[in-house]
Amino acid sequence: FGRVGGGIYTKAADVGADLVGKVEAGIPEDDPRNPAVIADNVGDNVGDVAGMGADLFGSFAESSCASLVVASVSKELNAKWGYMMFPLLVSAGGILSSFITSFFATSVPGLKVTEEKHVERNLSIQLYISTIMSTISTVIVSYFFLPEKFCVVVSEVAKNGTWCQGYASKWAACVCVVCGLWAGLLIGKITDYMTSYNYSPVQEVSKSCETGAATNIIFGLALGYKSVVIPIFALAITIYVSFRYVNMYGVALAALGMLSTLSTSLTIDAYGPITDNAGGIAEMTGLSANVRVKTDALDAAGNTTAAIGKGFAIGSAALVSLALFGAFVTRSHISGVDLLEPITFAGLVVGAMLPY
């Protein structure tokens, strides 16, 4: 509700403020004489900060619950408290990694922002650092807090988890988390490439404006359709690999892995509305034009980072929905569901992408 309601409110206020201010009244953007400006700034906080945070944290909680529910049917994972808590330890490692990543942004000399063009680069580097450190923490947690072999497929007859039809190793579970981690990074980078002014897709859309609004709309729509191809394949491969080796527990772990860098990705996502509001405050308080130029440069980078956050939210939601479904089926000991074949679901996701 926060995402949808807040998003509609944001865009309605934004478009309304621009139409009334720029087109009808002839006053600049974020001018204090336009009351809709306040609604626009508040809407950014509701839709892009509170709404996105609620969405991602909801997916995070759901993936944690799904992995714990699926793990509860395994006798080996129930043998020790540490084995059962493996999903939560993966999340804890991600939080610690994101905390350490924040020091790279503020304390490492080579990563400090000295020019406008470095803003977007430094934000992207933080995603890389967070993903690498989360990968290392996942390997360590897998080594110490998982048994060498554990049951992942329990037969329909033995509901107490004693009759096992499939086993997985600790390193297979580790691979599932790492696949989710790097699939999330890939989705973020593809989103960055497709929405950043530093790369050719956005530059081509900008150039198409020379021939009119119709061409611009067609170019933008085509770019949006084309941008889903690689993220869909990343999700499909992650689902297939995770399910193939660790069954539904692997899918839940992959979703958890994608969300383990949540602290960093949500911080980067909130950067956009914060800089947008900073520009609005600079305009309303009558600060110098030089200040507005700087906030506009930061806002341009913030628009890209906001798109990266949306990619994370959509990708993680796809994995979490399958993980929750798998948790229900696993706990209910339902075995006759054809959708539970990894190649079937991966093909379903890829097939849904083909019309675009």
Predicted regions and their residues:
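Hydrophobic packing and interface segments
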Residues: 1-356
